[in-house]
Structure formats: structure tokens, C-alpha cells
């Protein structure tokens, strides 16, 4: 299952704010040194009712006030470049979804910081993150007439 997330870096607290598109989420806590995700302010994350998006592939928890229940994500722009890495992030995440991988998720924090924060700081990309992959959720789909692809395109 996959869903789209809005996100923005809060430089004052050095945290990444994530929420599902179309949800009035209070945010989620990311474990480790990334810190807690604060509730998005109206100026930090633009309001989006998601009316232009298809609901297919969005788990029910995407519209929960607490946000999605499982965050398994990477920058969609990095999806193609991870295949030559020592571990392919999409493959690892898919295996975790199927319960086949024992790898700890602590390494994902370093991956995110390297791919996200470093590029923001060094390349000056303000709109760095557009689409994140969210998977591993066990909730039913809002619309499930057809099987949902694990990774969706932008």
C-alpha cells in the first residue's frame, strides 16, 4: 500500500514534518534523533483536501488524526538511485512489509539525513521532498477493487 505525504523541514527544531495528503493530521513521532513531528501550522504545510487525488491505495489510517500507522518511506526521486546501493531501500521495505527482513530500521535515519537534509543544505533545494513511499500498513484500503502496487509513481 502507498500514500502521498506532505512534508516540510522545520529548521528551528531540526525535524521533518510529515502528514498524509488530505488528512488533518496532528503528526507522527519519528524514532531516534529525528525527533518528534510537531503539529503542522497553517503556514508551514499548505492545506490540501486531497479532492484531486484518487483514494485508491490509501490505507484507512491515512485519514486518521494521528496520521498513518506505519511510516516506511524514501524520497521518490531517490528510488532509482538506490538499486545500486549495498541495500536497495524499496526492496528492503517491501521485504519488511512481508515480514521477511530482520534488518533494523535505525539505518533509515542516516539514509534520510544523507538524501534529504544534506541535499537541502548543500544544493539549496527548497522543495526537496514531494512524494514519499508509505508501506507496511496492515489496514484495509479505502478503495480496494484492484490490488494496489506497493510503490506508486509521482
From Swiss-Prot:
<keyword id="KW-0804">Transcription</keyword>
<feature type="compositionally biased region" description="Low complexity">
    <location>
        <begin position="30"/>
        <end position="46"/>
    </location>
</feature>
<comment type="subunit">
    <text>May form homodimer. May interact with host CEBPA, CFLAR, CREB1, DDB1, E4F1, HBXIP, HSPD1/HSP60, NFKBIA, POLR2E and SMAD4. Interacts with host SMC5-SMC6 complex and induces its degradation. Interacts with host TRPC4AP; leading to prevent ubiquitination of TRPC4AP. Interacts with host PLSCR1; this interaction promotes ubiquitination and degradation of HBx and impairs HBx-mediated cell proliferation.</text>
</comment>
<dbReference type="InterPro" id="IPR000236">
    <property type="entry name" value="Transactivation_prot_X"/>
</dbReference>
<keyword id="KW-0945">Host-virus interaction</keyword>
<dbReference type="Pfam" id="PF00739">
    <property type="entry name" value="X"/>
</dbReference>
<dbReference type="GO" id="GO:0039592">
    <property type="term" value="P:symbiont-mediated arrest of host cell cycle during G2/M transition"/>
</dbReference>
<feature type="region of interest" description="Disordered">
    <location>
        <begin position="28"/>
        <end position="48"/>
    </location>
</feature>
<keyword id="KW-1045">Host mitochondrion</keyword>
<keyword id="KW-1121">Modulation of host cell cycle by virus</keyword>
<dbReference type="GO" id="GO:0006351">
    <property type="term" value="P:DNA-templated transcription"/>
</dbReference>
<dbReference type="GO" id="GO:0042025">
    <property type="term" value="C:host cell nucleus"/>
</dbReference>
<comment type="function">
    <text>Multifunctional protein that plays a role in silencing host antiviral defenses and promoting viral transcription. Does not seem to be essential for HBV infection. May be directly involved in development of cirrhosis and liver cancer (hepatocellular carcinoma). Most of cytosolic activities involve modulation of cytosolic calcium. The effect on apoptosis is controversial depending on the cell types in which the studies have been conducted. May induce apoptosis by localizing in mitochondria and causing loss of mitochondrial membrane potential.</text>
</comment>
<comment type="similarity">
    <text>Belongs to the orthohepadnavirus protein X family.</text>
</comment>
<keyword id="KW-0053">Apoptosis</keyword>
<keyword id="KW-1035">Host cytoplasm</keyword>
<dbReference type="GO" id="GO:0085033">
    <property type="term" value="P:symbiont-mediated activation of host NF-kappaB cascade"/>
</dbReference>
<dbReference type="GO" id="GO:0019079">
    <property type="term" value="P:viral genome replication"/>
</dbReference>
<keyword id="KW-1079">Host G2/M cell cycle arrest by virus</keyword>
<keyword id="KW-1048">Host nucleus</keyword>
<feature type="region of interest" description="Mitochondrial targeting sequence">
    <location>
        <begin position="68"/>
        <end position="117"/>
    </location>
</feature>
<protein>
    <recommendedName>
        <fullName>Protein X</fullName>
    </recommendedName>
</protein>
<dbReference type="GO" id="GO:0033650">
    <property type="term" value="C:host cell mitochondrion"/>
</dbReference>
<keyword id="KW-1074">Activation of host NF-kappa-B by virus</keyword>
<keyword id="KW-0805">Transcription regulation</keyword>
<keyword id="KW-0010">Activator</keyword>
